[in-house]
Regions:
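PLP-dependent amino-acid enzyme catalytic core
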Residues: 1-485
Length: 485
């Protein structure tokens, strides 16, 4: 199977190389060459388990030995606390797809428990070593660290914005065990970290200094991170059919809290594979660059970066949008390169009227302020005794404003206990207390179970204390890599 760059159709790579490389050498993202020919047969999936469906989806994207692919899928999802992996919960106004039952209580686990196994399959028979570089707005970092911990032939360095993640998210990363893991805070925001990591990927001099080690990514720019996320859209649909909520072939809606555009792009890819989807709704917080883009066709990152109570969505540069635009433009690599060049040079671009019409046909959009987010957390708890985290609450608020036809699924991306300060403030009207005390009080009041991985977090040893300026990240990598040997 071949993948090509969104910015140059002549740059093609075998699937294993695209997976290991993460980002094309021209800065483009890898997309499957014959993706439009790929389809799934939903009828044949009705009696399948989550892991069975994952296998049927992933074999469309990777040419691994099928028995080995099945085996690593089973291993990855055995780490979840429920056999359903991503259970569906019915509320009054929508179904909530719980994506937080993995080892780090965030939706990133769905892909990042599997990605290390996929990389190991791609490395079979090779002495190649991979250095995973990851920028995180909170959840990707811990999920990637946990996934790659002590995995042979890999090392991982995670960068996060020092004041841009919640205390629990930071502690999850700074207490990370594993002889091949490094964590470093940067002075700046997530966009600064992500842009710097992308530039480092393209730094040939730095790559030479690393010798046999090659860079790869655990962010959703890596096709191996993105493709496993397609699975839970299909599984949610199948569950609705099994539960007699819809008939096979009925169209449904998905509302997705979105920052980097990876999660909602996975839904778009599921639709392209044949999933009956009416609308994909992009839900943003006050960093609503995507809302503006989907309504006007103008992408403009030249605005104030706002810190919100949904920090994993505090993003102004949505990397995976490039893959969507490549698809909507009919694989017009030159057009995509021109847009990305405009974004780099001027911080903005405008798509043509044809693409804007397609965007409006495929996607709904909306956004929520912090006050509106808190109100929804309180409202849903009081009315349904269901506890939302702030990111899911953003999506729920946007869902309530949409005039959607058919059943609707809201993607729930994290355990509410990862954001105790915001959730306790909304539900209990308590502020200015230690997050772990708030966790206890929230549990006492709601009786919602606290995930095992979060219970003893405050008693774990701090192992990572590094802090650098964004312009020193490349230098840090060289120093950190010596420590990881």
């Amino acid at each position: 199977m071949n993948y090509r760059s969104t910015r140059n159709n002549t740059i093609t790579k075998k699937d294993k190389i695209a997976l290991l490389q993460g980002l094309s050498e021209d800065g483009g993202l890898f997309v499957l060459e014959n993706f439009n020919e790929k389809k799934i047969d939903l009828k044949n999936l009705l009696d399948k388990s989550y892991t069975d469906i994952a296998f049927e989806v992933l074999k469309l994207f990777f040419s691994f030995d099928e028995s080995k692919l099945k085996s690593v899928i089973e291993k990855a999802y055995s780490k979840f606390s429920t056999k359903k992996v991503t259970p569906l919960v019915e509320l009054k106004d929508a179904h909530v797809l719980e994506l937080f039952h993995g080892p780090t209580s965030a939706f990133k686990d769905v892909a990042l428990t599997l990605l290390p196994y996929l990389i190991q399959l791609a490395l079979e028979g090779s002495d190649q070593e991979i250095l995973i570089l990851t920028a995180t707005s909170g959840d990707t970092g811990k999920a990637a660290l946990e996934g790659f911990k002590d995995v042979d032939q890999t090392e991982i360095i995670v960068f996060y914005p020092k004041n841009g993640v919640r205390k629990i998210q930071e502690l999850q990363m700074r207490t990370q065990e594993g002889k091949n893991t490094k964590v470093c805070a940067i002075e700046g925001n997530f966009d600064d970290a992500q842009t710097a990591v992308k530039n480092i990927f393209l730094d040939e001099d730095l790559q030479k200094k690393l010798g046999n080690k090659k860079f790869s990514s655990a962010n959703s720019i890596n096709i191996g991170r993105l493709t496993p996320q397609i699975v839970y859209y299909i599984v949610a649909y199948i569950d609705l059919v099994k539960n007699n909520k819809i008939n096979l072939g009925d169209k449904i809606n998905f509302v997705v809290p979105t920052g980097n555009f990876g999660d909602i792009l996975a839904g778009y890819y599921a639709k392209k594979l044949g999933l009956p989807v009416n609308k994909l709704v992009c839900a943003s917080n006050k960093n609503n660059v995507l809302y503006d883009f989907l309504t006007t066709g103008i992408y403009d990152r030249n605005r104030e970066f706002l810190k919100t109570i949904s920090p994993s969505m505090d993003i102004l540069i949505s990397s995976n949008l490039e893959r969507l635009l490549y698809d909507l433009s009919g694989s017009d690599d030159k057009y995509i390169k021109s847009l990305m060049d405009e974004l780099k040079q001027n911080g903005k671009y405008q798509v043509n009227t044809d693409i804007l019409a397609k965007l409006k046909a495929e996607f709904g959009s909306g956004y929520a302020s912090d006050e509106e987010t808190s109100h929804i957390i309180k409202k849903v708890w009081e009315e349904e005794k269901y506890l939302l985290d702030p990111h899911t609450a953003v999506a729920y608020k946007v869902m309530l404003e949409q005039n959607l036809e058919g059943e609707t699924v809201v993607l729930s991306t994290a355990s509410p206990y990862k954001f105790c300060t915001s959730v306790a403030n909304a539900v209990l009207n308590i502020t200015d207390e230690d997050e772990f005390k708030l966790m206890e009080k929230l549990h006492e009041f709601t009786k919602v179970p606290v995930p095992e991985n979060l219970k003893d977090l405050n008693s774990k040893e701090i192992r990572h204390n590094d802090l650098v300026k964004r312009e020193d990240m490349a230098k840090y990598i060289l120093e950190a890599e010596k420590c990881l040997k």
